[in-house]
A protein has these predicted regions:
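Peripheral, non-AAA+ core regions of ATP-driven protein-machinery
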Residues: 1-215, 219-226, 326, 462, ...
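Conserved catalytic network of the ASCE P-loop NTPase/AAA+ motor domain
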Residues: 26, 57-60, 97-99, 129-131, ...
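Basic, amphipathic alpha-helical bundle interface domains used for macromolecular binding and assembly
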Residues: 35-46, 61, 68-78, 285, ...
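Residues immediately C-terminal
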Residues: 112, 298-299, 305-306, 392
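Conserved alpha-helical scaffold flanking the Walker A/P-loop in AAA+ ATPase domains
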Residues: 205, 259-265, 270-298, 330-331
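Walker A/P-loop
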Residues: 215-258, 320
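The Walker A (P-loop) glycine that initiates the GxxxxGKT/S ATP-binding motif of P-loop NTPases
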Residues: 218, 280, 302
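Walker B catalytic acidic pair
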Residues: 295, 301-302, 313
Length: 497
């Protein structure tokens, strides 16, 4: 048969659109033509495939070979199509039966010797192959990752000879059995490591229970970074769908095998990070820090030291849970449902309000420092907390109830109430959801309106305050929001919202 079709997958953002590799052999002068909008790395695959086929002991057909990567309008890059191209040529030349390739998708880069090398973005391709009802042929190094798509038949190969023997029926490979190494997660740091700071720990529990954004303000050395690093351990475990989304992003963005799955990500970019580094971008858009923090925590230390323009691009993803990057050729959408935790000093030197009087910053310097953060950005942060310096104690006694396990139990119970009631965390309630789930008595409503007027809170800040109060009620397993919940929620709002 002079025509063969092999299925593969491209990599576009965190998605894996289907690519059909069509191979046709015709009479004429020997030549190999590759069409279908291939980029440089794909064009170079012609030479890799020829050498791999010959060095594996197979015949490279001395005919006019046309390879079409369909659809033609989808850009293709990388060496992920090498294996599919080689199998297509062998099937079209009759060296393996073409019918054996009908229910399999192939991914893998070929070495000149015929060895099959790993590729990036295998998990999105595995999920797409499972949805299409086909098996997936992958390099052995990617097999564990592909097996995360439960129910998918994964065939792992190390060399082109193995793949050909399998499809020719000489040595049929059994589906790969995952060893489960990827399902081991690293332990989170414990909350008991933080000395004192009871109010800050309370704010962490509230933030975890309702998925609220959090801002710590305080002098250096008070434990702001230490506190933020404890938040992922308080969050509920990822469900299977969330874990697969996180793993798919890591699969696309990382050049190393997946580790620590399922684990909530904790990202801490440096304050010199650019806009594309934070939200994603480039000529070929890549996921940024907010996407890498999907279903996890994005920690911005020294918040005012970030470029103001960089911080402003966070506003839309904080509301929508995704980021759209537009380029001349296409638009790419990346998920970005992250929980923001930020830390900052109260002034440029960091010691404003210290009893020692070390601060020498002028009011103008302090105002200029705080003006680096816009009102709309601060409005989107639900919990604002000042972290004061505690009495120095090098070996404090551990509080028995001050552990991550105890706090995580409270958070899990509150989250369960929210999921049963409205299907999402309180922070993600839309306006109709706020009106339905955050109802107040007439007296409490009037009291809250008066408080918001005195504190000059915006309507958005008032709605976020109601969500925090709803979370406080859930932590106490209370059905209705009470005055004490509103009063505590007000404590976490700055006076100029």
């Amino acid at each position: 048969m002079s025509l063969a079709i092999v299925y593969s997958r491209a990599r576009v953002g965190v998605e894996a659109p289907a690519v059909t590799v069509e191979t046709h052999l015709a009479n004429g002068l020997p030549a190999l033509t590759l069409v279908g909008l291939p980029e440089t790395a794909v064009k170079e695959s012609k030479d890799r495939v020829r050498s791999a086929i010959l060095n594996s002991g197979f015949e490279f057909p001395a005919r006019r070979i046309t390879l079409n990567l369909a659809p033609a309008d989808l850009p293709k890059d990388g060496g992920r199509f090498d294996l599919a191209i080689a199998l297509g040529i062998l099937a079209a030349s009759g060296q393996i039966p073409a019918v054996s390739l009908a229910q399999v998708e192939c991914l893998g880069e070929l070495a000149l010797s015929g060895a099959i090398r790993s590729v990036q973005g295998v998990l999105p391709a595995a999920l797409a192959a499972r949805a299409a009802g086909r098996a997936l042929l992958v390099p052995l190094a990617n097999a564990e990752e592909a097996c995360l798509a439960s129910g998918l038949t994964v065939i792992a190969v190390e060399h082109l000879l193995q793949a050909v023997a399998h499809f020719a029926g000489r040595t049929v490979l059994e589906p790969y059995g995952a060893s489960g190494l990827l399902r081991e997660s690293m332990p989170y740091p414990d909350l008991s490591d933080v000395q004192g700071q009871l109010s800050a720990k309370r704010a962490l529990v509230i933030a975890a229970a309702g998925s609220h954004n959090l801002l710590f303000t305080g002098p250096p050395g008070t434990g702001k970074t230490l506190l933020a690093s404890r938040l992922p351990g308080l969050l509920p475990p990822l469900n299977e769908q969330e874990a697969l989304e996180v793993a798919a992003i890591q699969s696309v963005a990382s050049h190393v095998p997946l580790k620590c799955w399922p684990q909530r990500p904790f990202r801490q970019p440096h304050h010199s990070a650019s806009g594309p580094a934070l939200v994603g971008g480039g000529s070929k858009p890549q996921p940024g820090e907010i996407t890498l923090a999907h279903h996890g925590v994005l920690f911005l230390d020294e918040l005012p030291e970030f470029d103001r323009k960089v911080l402003e691009v966070l506003r839309e993803p904080m509301e929508s849970g995704f980021i759209v990057i537009a380029r001349a050729r296409d638009r790419m959408r990346f998920p970005a449902r992250f929980q923001l935790v930020a830390a900052m000093n109260p002034c440029p030197c960091g010691y404003l309000g210290e009893p020692t009087g070390r601060c020498r910053c002028t009011p103008e310097h302090i105002q200029r420092y705080r003006n680096k953060l816009s009102g709309p950005l601060l409005d989107r942060i639900d919990l604002h907390l000042t972290v004061a310096r505690e009495t120095t104690s090098l070996n404090p006694p551990l509080a028995s109830g001050d552990t991550t396990a105890n706090a995580a139990g409270l958070v899990a119970a509150a989250r369960e109430r929210q999921l049963q009631r409205q299907g999402c965390a309180n922070a993600f309630l839309d306006l109709p959801g706020v009106r339905t789930q955050c109802r107040l008595s007439d007296m409490d409503n009037s009291w809250l309106e008066a408080a918001c007027e005195r504190m000059t809170l915006s309507l958005r800040a008032a709605h976020r305050l109601l969500k925090v109060a709803r979370t406080l009620a859930d932590l106490e397993q209370a059905h209705n929001i009470e005055r004490k919940h509103l009063a505590e929620a007000l404590q976490y709002r700055p006076f100029s919202g």
